[in-house]
Each structure stands twice: as structure tokens, then as C-alpha cells.
Regions:
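Intrinsically disordered, low-complexity regions enriched for glutamine and histidine
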Residues: 1, 14, 198-200
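Short acidic, Pro/Gly- and aromatic-enriched capping/linker segments at domain boundaries
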Residues: 1-11, 66
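Cys/His-rich metal-chelating microdomains
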Residues: 13, 17, 45-48
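Charged, low-complexity intrinsically disordered segments and flexible loops
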Residues: 23-209
């Protein structure tokens, strides 16, 4: 069996056609590569999502924090950890709320899923985790997929994975909030979703004046 790197155009999760590199060995490996490409967003959309969480301003997004569950000591610790995460991500959430990019609503839904988590153990186990850009992209892709896939790894820091095991209604609500990138054949470009100023009609002088 050959193990050559092959580049080919492939349809991505966002509906865009992107050049992908396929390098897995054998026919089953090639199939796995194709399925992975189909289950992830294109490079341009990945960069769009990353830009959305970069350089937040000084704003803050109000979040209703649920009561944490666990032993008293764990709850106290988890509260501090969750508050630290909120201070870090709150300004980003405020920025997302103001953005017309359809991906912004999906990213905001991801963060809101995160802060709905009530398990003290989750916050403690992930106390060193930064919920960075790569995490955001993975979470948005989880929301966008019509069904689970075995070609993408799961991890314990995922809010999507947590709620898939605890309460699917939370995921359903997040998908509804992110419908602009889910219920579409192709995700619109960021510029296409931005409101444009109405054009003023050019009026010729009236002959009656």
C-alpha cells in the first residue's frame, strides 16, 4: 500500500470546497481522511472563528451562572475557577453579541453551553485549560455536525461532550442559537452577513418646481 500525500478538493462541514491533504495509509485511511474533511470547517472559516475571539474589548456579557454541585470544598474551588474563566471570556462574549458574522452566534452559544455546566469536577479537572481558539473551533464544529463522527477526537474539556452525556436539550438550544451556520448549505461569508447602508435614490429636479 502506498503512503503518499495527496491533495484534493473536498467539501467541508461549512459547505465550502477546500484543498485538503490526504496522507493516511490504505483505502480505509483515505476514507477516514475524507470523512474528517467533511466533518471539519475549511481553513478560511477556521480563521474567521479565530478572529472572532481575538482582541476583545472592555465590554462584558451578562451570564446567569447556575448553582454548582459537588462537595462543599469542591464547589468553593470550582466557583473561583469558573469566575476566572468568565472574567477571561466575558469580554469576548460581549464582542460576539455585537458581531453580524453568523459564526459569532455559534461561538457565543458554545460559551453559554460552557457556563451552564454545573459539575464542580468539570471546572476543577479543567482548571489549567484556557478554552482557546482551537477549543472554540472544535466546539463550533461539534454543533454544526448533523450526527456524531468517529473521525474527530473527543476530549474531557468539551462542553458539547459534557452535555451530550448529561442533557441533550442544552445542545438542542445551542444548535437553535447557531442555526445560521447549521441550517444552511453553505455558510455565508462574513461580509455577506453585514448590514449595508441603504442607497439614496438619485432624484432629478422636478419639472413642476
Amino acid at each position: 500500500m502506498s503512503h503518499a500525500h495527496i491533495s484534493a478538493m473536498s467539501k467541508r462541514l461549512c459547505g465550502h470546497i477546500d484543498m485538503c491533504s490526504f496522507s493516511s495509509k490504505g483505502r480505509s485511511g483515505r476514507i477516514s481522511d475524507v470523512l474528517y474533511a467533511n466533518a471539519t470547517v475549511c481553513d478560511e472559516c477556521r480563521e474567521r472563528i479565530c478572529r472572532l475571539v481575538d482582541k476583545p474589548g472592555a465590554g462584558f456579557h451578562p451570564v446567569a451562572l447556575p448553582t454548582l454541585v459537588g462537595r462543599d470544598g469542591a464547589v468553593r474551588w470550582a466557583k473561583d475557577l469558573r469566575l476566572r474563566a468568565l472574567r477571561m471570556l466575558g469580554p469576548i462574549m460581549a464582542k460576539l453579541k455585537q458581531s453580524p458574522d453568523p459564526f459569532a452566534a455559534a461561538v457565543l452559544a458554545v460559551y453559554e453551553m460552557l457556563f451552564k455546566i454545573t459539575s464542580s469536577a468539570f471546572w476543577i479537572d479543567n482548571r489549567q485549560f484556557s478554552y482557546d481558539r482551537a477549543w472554540v473551533v472544535f466546539e463550533v464544529e461539534h454543533l454544526m455536525r448533523p450526527r456524531p463522527t468517529s473521525t474527530v477526537r473527543l476530549n474531557s474539556s468539551s462542553a458539547f461532550v459534557y452535555w451530550s452525556q448529561v442533557d441533550l436539550s442544552v445542545i438542542a438550544a445551542a444548535k437553535e442559537a447557531a442555526h445560521a451556520v447549521i441550517d444552511v448549505e453553505v455558510v455565508l461569508a462574513a461580509s455577506a452577513s453585514e448590514p449595508t447602508a441603504p442607497k439614496q435614490a438619485h432624484c432629478a429636479p422636478s419639472i413642476f418646481l
